Design a protein with these regions (language model features):
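Rhodanese-like catalytic fold shared by cysteine-dependent sulfurtransferases
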Residues: 2-4, 8-49, 53-90
Length: 90
């Protein structure tokens, strides 16, 4: 299954720990109003799981992605929730 996992925390938080395979794109990148290069060629129906520490930043990023036409956004809340979700999917 094709999916993208985005950790929306700051670089230092991502560097401490993150979900395997996640890419780090902070909300400030999305605040420019443009889609980051990492997502430029991503099909709009690709599953995109976003997470942060508490779900607030990931919720904001999810809303921005929806405004850009992405249709399969999952707010994974935090690293632990995403890890659990991925383990259950196996």
């Amino acid at each position: 299954m094709n999916r993208i996992i985005i950790d929306t925390r700051e670089d230092f938080e991502f560097n401490e720990s993150h979900v395997d395979g996640a890419i780090n794109i902070s909300p400030s990148v999305f605040a420019t109003g443009k889609i980051p290069p990492e997502l430029a060629s991503t099909p709009k129906d690709t599953e995109i799981i976003v997470y942060c520490r508490s779900g607030q930043r990931s919720n904001t990023v999810g809303q921005i992605l929806r405004m850009h036409g992405f249709t399969n956004i999952v707010n994974g809340i935090n690293e632990q929730h995403v890890t659990k979700r991925l383990n259950e999917a196996v």
